[in-house]
From Swiss-Prot:
Primary location: nucleus
Places the protein is found: Nucleus, Nucleolus
Keywords annotated in UniProt: Nucleus
Family: Belongs to the SWM2 family.
Pfam families documented for this protein: Swm2 (PF17083)
Protein name: Nucleolar protein SWM2
Any GO CC annotation of this UniProt entry: nucleolus
InterPro entries xrefs: Swm2
Amino acid sequence: MIDLYNYSNLEGLLDGLTDLNRIPKEYSAVLEPYFQNIARNAHLKSRALKICRSNFHKWNEEGAKTVNPEIIRRCLNLWYVLKGKEYKKLKDPPPADNIIKDEIDVSYVKNLNEVRLEFDEFGKLISNPLENLILEEVEVNDFIQE
């Protein structure tokens, strides 16, 4: 079995972190497990923080002229994983991307309770836990005050 989180792979990820040709924007959403493994290695963690600081500095100096907003989002996510807190010194951070999921039809799914049993508040087994699942599209901007 291949170890996706070995030192060499994590080092390669850091090499390409700020290059959208090497790691396209579409992959940003799946980078967190890699970030968590980077956090476990002192050398990689130090290198990652240096990369983030450099990009934050460029962003604060010149904004989106020199640094793609997606790179800043990646660095903000990486910083949060490594430090356990948000980076607060960033001027005018790029807006967060909306999370959009396609419609999902779970009506055909059977035997859901074989994988995971769920119980109601009275301790009674729920036969089809996703039966009443409702997903709605929500604009995050409606809830964020400027």
